[in-house]
Protein backbone atom coordinates (compact mmCIF):
# COMPACT_ATOMS: atom_id res chain seq x y z
CA UNK A 1 0.00 0.00 0.00
CA UNK A 2 1.19 3.50 -0.76
CA UNK A 3 2.24 5.49 2.30
CA UNK A 4 2.23 9.19 1.60
CA UNK A 5 5.61 10.57 2.70
CA UNK A 6 5.62 13.92 0.93
CA UNK A 7 3.11 16.46 -0.34
CA UNK A 8 1.07 15.51 -3.39
CA UNK A 9 0.16 18.36 -5.75
CA UNK A 10 -2.66 17.89 -8.26
CA UNK A 11 -1.93 19.98 -11.35
CA UNK A 12 -5.62 20.24 -12.23
CA UNK A 13 -8.71 22.10 -11.13
CA UNK A 14 -10.98 19.23 -12.19
CA UNK A 15 -13.56 18.49 -9.49
CA UNK A 16 -13.72 14.90 -10.73
CA UNK A 17 -9.98 14.37 -10.32
CA UNK A 18 -10.12 15.90 -6.84
CA UNK A 19 -12.96 13.54 -5.94
CA UNK A 20 -11.04 10.50 -7.20
CA UNK A 21 -7.93 11.36 -5.17
CA UNK A 22 -10.11 11.95 -2.11
CA UNK A 23 -11.80 8.57 -2.67
CA UNK A 24 -8.32 7.01 -2.77
CA UNK A 25 -7.64 8.46 0.69
CA UNK A 26 -4.86 10.77 -0.49
CA UNK A 27 -4.05 14.18 0.96
CA UNK A 28 -3.23 16.71 -1.74
CA UNK A 29 -3.28 20.35 -2.67
CA UNK A 30 -4.13 21.87 -6.03
CA UNK A 31 -1.96 24.02 -8.28
CA UNK A 32 -3.61 24.38 -11.68
CA UNK A 33 -1.21 24.22 -14.60
CA UNK A 34 -1.08 26.95 -17.22
CA UNK A 35 0.72 24.76 -19.77
CA UNK A 36 0.11 25.09 -23.49
CA UNK A 37 -2.41 22.42 -24.47
CA UNK A 38 -1.94 22.50 -28.23
CA UNK A 39 -0.41 19.32 -29.62
CA UNK A 40 -1.16 16.98 -32.52
CA UNK A 41 -0.52 13.26 -32.56
CA UNK A 42 -2.25 9.99 -31.81
CA UNK A 43 -4.69 10.11 -28.88
CA UNK A 44 -2.19 8.33 -26.62
CA UNK A 45 0.66 10.64 -27.66
CA UNK A 46 -1.56 13.66 -27.04
CA UNK A 47 -2.61 12.75 -23.50
CA UNK A 48 0.93 11.74 -22.54
CA UNK A 49 2.48 14.93 -23.91
CA UNK A 50 -0.16 17.22 -22.41
CA UNK A 51 0.01 15.55 -18.99
CA UNK A 52 3.83 15.93 -19.09
CA UNK A 53 3.58 19.62 -19.95
CA UNK A 54 1.12 20.22 -17.13
CA UNK A 55 3.27 18.37 -14.59
CA UNK A 56 6.45 20.16 -15.67
CA UNK A 57 4.81 23.59 -15.43
CA UNK A 58 3.68 22.93 -11.85
CA UNK A 59 6.89 21.12 -10.79
CA UNK A 60 8.84 24.34 -11.31
CA UNK A 61 6.84 25.89 -8.45
CA UNK A 62 7.26 23.09 -5.86
CA UNK A 63 10.18 21.29 -4.26
CA UNK A 64 9.91 18.20 -2.08
CA UNK A 65 6.61 17.10 -3.60
CA UNK A 66 5.06 14.71 -6.07
CA UNK A 67 3.27 16.48 -8.90
CA UNK A 68 0.36 14.61 -10.51
CA UNK A 69 -1.03 15.85 -13.82
CA UNK A 70 -3.53 14.25 -16.18
CA UNK A 71 -5.13 14.86 -19.53
CA UNK A 72 -8.20 13.07 -20.86
CA UNK A 73 -9.70 12.95 -24.32
CA UNK A 74 -12.36 10.99 -26.15
CA UNK A 75 -11.64 9.44 -29.54
CA UNK A 76 -14.26 8.12 -31.92
CA UNK A 77 -13.69 9.11 -35.54
CA UNK A 78 -11.89 12.21 -34.28
CA UNK A 79 -10.39 13.59 -31.08
CA UNK A 80 -13.08 15.06 -28.86
CA UNK A 81 -12.03 17.49 -26.17
CA UNK A 82 -14.42 19.70 -24.21
CA UNK A 83 -17.12 21.26 -26.40
CA UNK A 84 -16.96 25.03 -26.86
CA UNK A 85 -20.71 25.42 -27.32
CA UNK A 86 -24.03 23.62 -26.95
CA UNK A 87 -24.07 23.05 -30.71
CA UNK A 88 -20.66 21.40 -30.61
CA UNK A 89 -21.81 19.23 -27.68
CA UNK A 90 -24.83 18.11 -29.72
CA UNK A 91 -22.60 17.23 -32.68
CA UNK A 92 -20.22 15.23 -30.46
CA UNK A 93 -23.03 13.29 -28.79
CA UNK A 94 -24.70 12.51 -32.13
CA UNK A 95 -21.36 11.12 -33.32
CA UNK A 96 -21.05 8.90 -30.24
CA UNK A 97 -24.63 7.60 -30.40
CA UNK A 98 -24.94 3.83 -30.87
CA UNK A 99 -21.17 3.42 -31.25
CA UNK A 100 -18.00 2.43 -29.45
CA UNK A 101 -15.33 5.02 -28.69
CA UNK A 102 -12.18 5.20 -26.57
CA UNK A 103 -11.38 7.40 -23.60
CA UNK A 104 -7.67 8.04 -23.09
CA UNK A 105 -6.09 9.53 -19.99
CA UNK A 106 -2.43 10.34 -19.72
CA UNK A 107 -0.99 10.61 -16.22
CA UNK A 108 2.40 12.12 -15.42
CA UNK A 109 3.99 12.22 -11.99
CA UNK A 110 7.14 14.14 -11.17
CA UNK A 111 8.91 13.56 -7.86
CA UNK A 112 10.65 16.91 -7.37
CA UNK A 113 12.84 15.39 -4.61
CA UNK A 114 14.60 13.04 -7.03
CA UNK A 115 13.63 14.37 -10.45
CA UNK A 116 11.96 11.04 -11.31
CA UNK A 117 9.31 11.35 -14.02
CA UNK A 118 6.69 8.70 -14.80
CA UNK A 119 4.19 8.97 -17.64
CA UNK A 120 1.55 6.35 -18.40
CA UNK A 121 -1.65 6.21 -20.43
CA UNK A 122 -4.86 4.26 -19.96
CA UNK A 123 -7.57 3.48 -22.51
CA UNK A 124 -11.17 2.53 -21.79
CA UNK A 125 -13.67 1.53 -24.47
CA UNK A 126 -17.18 2.94 -24.02
CA UNK A 127 -20.39 2.09 -25.90
CA UNK A 128 -23.32 4.48 -26.18
CA UNK A 129 -26.91 3.37 -26.77
CA UNK A 130 -28.79 4.93 -29.69
CA UNK A 131 -29.73 8.46 -28.63
CA UNK A 132 -32.62 10.37 -30.15
CA UNK A 133 -32.31 14.03 -31.06
CA UNK A 134 -34.62 14.72 -28.09
CA UNK A 135 -32.30 12.76 -25.77
CA UNK A 136 -29.34 14.81 -26.96
CA UNK A 137 -31.15 18.16 -26.70
CA UNK A 138 -32.45 17.39 -23.20
CA UNK A 139 -29.01 16.27 -22.00
CA UNK A 140 -27.22 19.28 -23.47
CA UNK A 141 -29.84 21.56 -21.85
CA UNK A 142 -28.69 20.31 -18.41
CA UNK A 143 -25.30 21.95 -19.00
CA UNK A 144 -23.48 18.81 -17.87
CA UNK A 145 -21.79 18.09 -21.23
CA UNK A 146 -20.18 21.51 -21.56
CA UNK A 147 -17.13 20.97 -19.32
CA UNK A 148 -16.34 17.36 -20.16
CA UNK A 149 -14.23 15.70 -22.83
CA UNK A 150 -16.54 14.10 -25.38
CA UNK A 151 -19.49 16.12 -24.03
CA UNK A 152 -20.60 13.59 -21.42
CA UNK A 153 -20.06 12.60 -17.82
CA UNK A 154 -20.32 8.86 -17.12
CA UNK A 155 -20.68 9.62 -13.40
CA UNK A 156 -23.64 11.95 -14.02
CA UNK A 157 -26.67 11.96 -16.27
CA UNK A 158 -24.51 10.96 -19.22
CA UNK A 159 -24.18 7.52 -17.64
CA UNK A 160 -27.73 6.66 -18.69
CA UNK A 161 -26.61 6.56 -22.33
CA UNK A 162 -23.77 4.08 -21.73
CA UNK A 163 -24.55 0.39 -21.82
CA UNK A 164 -21.03 -1.11 -21.81
CA UNK A 165 -17.47 -0.24 -20.90
CA UNK A 166 -14.26 -2.22 -21.26
CA UNK A 167 -11.57 -0.99 -18.89
CA UNK A 168 -11.34 1.44 -16.01
CA UNK A 169 -14.49 3.32 -15.03
CA UNK A 170 -12.43 5.94 -13.15
CA UNK A 171 -10.41 6.52 -16.34
CA UNK A 172 -13.61 7.65 -18.06
CA UNK A 173 -14.29 9.99 -15.13
CA UNK A 174 -10.83 11.51 -15.58
CA UNK A 175 -8.22 9.67 -13.50
CA UNK A 176 -7.59 5.89 -13.56
CA UNK A 177 -7.26 4.91 -9.89
CA UNK A 178 -5.35 1.64 -10.35
CA UNK A 179 -2.83 3.34 -12.64
CA UNK A 180 -2.33 6.23 -10.20
CA UNK A 181 -1.84 3.82 -7.30
CA UNK A 182 0.75 1.82 -9.24
CA UNK A 183 2.66 4.95 -10.24
CA UNK A 184 2.71 6.25 -6.65
CA UNK A 185 4.04 2.88 -5.45
CA UNK A 186 6.71 2.95 -8.16
CA UNK A 187 7.87 6.42 -7.06
CA UNK A 188 7.82 5.33 -3.42
CA UNK A 189 10.02 2.29 -4.16
CA UNK A 190 12.48 4.52 -6.02
CA UNK A 191 12.91 6.59 -2.82
CA UNK A 192 13.88 3.60 -0.65
Segments from the language model and where they lie:
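A short beta-strand-loop structural module common to alpha/beta enzyme folds
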Residues: 29-37
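Short, glycine/serine-rich, charged loops/turns that create anion-binding
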Residues: 15, 35, 114
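N-terminal beta1-alpha1 ligand-phosphate binding loop
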Residues: 2-26
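Short loop/helix-cap segments at secondary-structure boundaries that form the rim of catalytic
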Residues: 19-23, 39-40, 60-61
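Anionic-ligand binding patches
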Residues: 2-9, 41-192
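Short linear Ser/Thr-Pro motifs
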Residues: 12-14, 33, 168-170
Amino acid sequence: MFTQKCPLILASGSPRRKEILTTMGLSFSVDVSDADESFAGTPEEMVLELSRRKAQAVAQRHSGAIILAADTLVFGDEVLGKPHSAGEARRMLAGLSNRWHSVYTGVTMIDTRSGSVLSRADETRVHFIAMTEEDIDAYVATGEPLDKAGAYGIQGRGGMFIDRIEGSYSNVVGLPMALVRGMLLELEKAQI
